[in-house]
Amino acid sequence: KKKKKSENGFWYYYNTKVADSLTTPKFGDTLIYNYSIKDINKTVIYSKADLKQQTYIMDKQELFTGLREGLKLMRSGETVTFLFPSQKAYGYYGDENKIGTNVPLICEVTLLDIKTTEPY
């Protein structure tokens, strides 16, 4: 698969890509997605079942930097695999559970839906 380098310092490739005519998320949109986290050897740290379906309001909630930036590149229905260096993931402190200090991560993310914030 052809990897792309983001302007934000991580690599990614599309597992499933949809038409470019669909929009990417904007500030305040609600995203529904699921994802898994693996280490650099592709050993699963957290599966999609472990992490369950996620809801995130774009740029209004805490999320590790790489995932926040990665979601901005995605369209509804896409699955993308990201390779995040540790500073874009959990950095020096890890997640204080299964992710240790300075661990680069592979995240496979499926963006299920984007609910746009309609102006009133």
What are these regions (language model features)?
Residues K1-Y120:
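Cross-family detector of peptidyl-prolyl cis-trans isomerase
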